[in-house]
Design a protein with these regions (language model features):
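Conserved N-terminal alpha-helix of the aminotransferase class I/II PLP-enzyme fold
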Residues: 2-43
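PLP-dependent aminotransferase-like
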Residues: 56-117
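Active-site phosphate-binding strand-loop segment of PLP-dependent enzymes
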Residues: 91-152
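Short beta-strand-to-turn element immediately C-terminal to the catalytic PLP-Schiff-base lysine
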Residues: 165, 186-192
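Single conserved hydrophobic/aromatic residue that forms the stacking wall/gate
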Residues: 194-203
Length: 203
């Protein structure tokens, strides 16, 4: 058993090889910080939600979120404000959130603390992430991205925009799904640890 050997570092307080790996990952993904997660992207998604929501807070999200999001809401007592994506009846799949739907949800729930976006959905559908990030930030809300199926967005050409490139505050990236790593390995990406608490207003 080598789990307590100092050269292997400590995931909860990295100071050597794990810290270096996280710094390299942050650089590769264009994030300010990257945290290695070994509980799958479920743990990354739950960490995102639990870090910005407390009991009674509202969070805007698509109806087709992963169950890890719902589990996080149960744990913290936050209130979901659902956006119902349209359905492609020919293929039988749900689509992404439309800008107009998100704008309506923000207008009707200005007290929401965050907007969560699937980037992409399980079926590869992407919402207009840049526009949604801007709407969320203009309203003083965080924008969180579940990128369980979007690892390749950071490294391929002619790919949809990644969460970090779009300016999302946090993203959960499932390295083992489309990144080629071992099962349950995931990254929690953070663009910035500082966020304003009031909506930005033009002067």
């Amino acid at each position: 058993d080598v789990n307590s050997m100092k050269p292997l570092d400590n995931l909860c307080h990295p100071i050597s090889v794990i810290r270096e790996a996280e710094e390299l990952a942050a650089d590769a993904f264009g994030a300010a910080h990257a945290f290695l997660m070994v509980g799958g992207t479920t743990s990354s998604v739950q960490t995102m939600v639990l870090s910005v929501c407390k009991r009674g807070d509202k969070i805007i999200l698509p109806r087709n979120v992963h169950r890890s999001v719902i589990n996080a809401l149960v744990l913290c007592g936050a209130i979901p404000v659902y956006v119902n994506p349209e359905v492609n009846h020919h293929r039988g799949i749900s689509l992404g959130m439309k800008r107009e739907q998100v704008a309506k949800a923000i207008a009707e729930h200005p007290d929401a603390v965050a907007v969560l976006v699937n980037n992409p959905t399980y079926y590869g559908i992407c919402s207009d992430l840049k526009a949604i990030v801007k709407m969320a930030h203009d309203a003083g809300m965080y924008c969180l991205a579940d990128e369980a199926h979007g690892t390749h967005f950071y490294f391929g050409e002619d790919m949809p925009v990644s969460a970090m490139e779009a300016g999302a505050d946090m993203a959960s990236v499932s390295m083992h799904k489309s990144g080629g790593s071992l099962t349950q390995s995931s990254l929690l990406l953070v663009l910035s640890l500082i966020h304003i608490s009031e909506p930005t207003r033009p002067i």
